[in-house]
Design a protein with these regions (language model features):
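Short amphipathic
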Residues: 2-7
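Rieske [2Fe-2S] iron-sulfur-binding domain
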Residues: 18-106
């Protein structure tokens, strides 16, 4: 089941926002001008803080990552895998844009 989050144009390209999905903080990212979005848990497992939506988006070896604004670990936007230590992955969510509306799988 997908929850409607916001209009795609509410997310500035190259940034992320935080959304509440089924009671969980989810970081939703729009890496480019295109209507492609990614969603992972907003909780940085290293800092135990809800900050990943404010991280910087980058690309490494053809994959998109977000760097935590606190301790700078990198998390894969598609899978939630931590580049520096795979023991500290974050949950990834199915995300899509449907008729201009961002939707996240609950």
């Amino acid at each position: 089941m997908f929850e409607q989050i916001c209009d795609i144009n509410d997310i500035v390209p190259g940034t992320g926002v935080c959304a509440l999905v089924s009671g969980q903080q989810v970081a939703v990212f729009r890496p480019t001008e295109e209507e492609a979005v990614f969603a992972i848990s907003n909780t940085d497992p290293f800092a135990q803080s809800n900050v990943l939506s404010r991280g910087l988006i980058g690309e490494h070896k053809g994959e998109l990552w977000v760097a935590s604004p606190l301790k700078k670990q990198h998390f894969n936007l598609a899978t939630g895998v931590c580049m520096e230590d795979e023991r500290f992955n974050v949950k990834s969510y199915q995300a899509r844009v449907n008729s201009g509306i961002v939707e996240i799988s609950a």
